[in-house]
Amino acid sequence: MTVYKGIYTVGITGASGAQYGIRLVQEMKKKGYKVHLVITEAGWQVFREELLIQTDDRKMVIDELFAAGDGEVSFHQLDDYTAPIASGSYQNRGMIIIPCSMGTLSGIAQGASGNLLERTADVMLKEKRRLVIVPRETPLNQIHLENMLKLSKMGVTILPAMPGFYQLPKTMDDLIDFVVGKALDQLGIEHELFTRWGEERDNHSR
């Protein structure tokens, strides 16, 4: 039987920024974690637009994106309420939705459980397990902010997709890695995706 470092759920929605979720899952699998992956229909549409994917074979896309690493990625259909992550008895260490659309955010805040993604988030709340939401929207209206505040009061971590620049990023990957690294920090997973403030930076000075 394979022993994993931990088990987490990752949700990817239709907010722009699919690369955040992809990079996160790749890093978790590389480090030996088991990842339950749920992608909304709008999330798949964003995959096609942002990754220039031409095929409709979703399994092939998942297999190609997450081929490397010692962990495991289990993909679940959005309407599969029989998935283990839909139950509080399953030992799911935590969940992150990256990026998170405002529609999904609203559904979670209202306890809608309208699909597997929302149901799993609801399980995290009722079991008082770690739930991290990475919103990717701008500007924000009052409803968005109130939903974030409501979830924050329940113990949810709201981690906006806002990259830092003190590490002097040179590429788009550097910006993506900063946000993904922050997300991994919240999940308690060690990484080397960016240089932390105060650490030596390649011959740069402030």
UniProtKB/Swiss-Prot annotation:
A GO term, aspect molecular function: flavin prenyltransferase activity
Presence of keyword Kinase: no
Keywords from the named record: Flavoprotein, FMN, Prenyltransferase, Transferase
Family the UniProt entry places it in: Belongs to the UbiX/PAD1 family.
UniProt: dimethylallyl phosphate binding residues: 166, 182
Catalytic activity: dimethylallyl phosphate + FMNH2 = prenylated FMNH2 + phosphate
InterPro entries reported in the protein's UniProt record: Flavin_trans-like, Flavoprotein, UbiX-like
Function: Flavin prenyltransferase that catalyzes the synthesis of the prenylated FMN cofactor (prenyl-FMN) for 4-hydroxy-3-polyprenylbenzoic acid decarboxylase UbiD. The prenyltransferase is metal-independent and links a dimethylallyl moiety from dimethylallyl monophosphate (DMAP) to the flavin N5 and C6 atoms of FMN.
Name of this chain's protein: Flavin prenyltransferase UbiX
Originating organism: Halalkalibacterium halodurans (strain ATCC BAA-125 / DSM 18197 / FERM 7344 / JCM 9153 / C-125)
EC number: 2.5.1.129
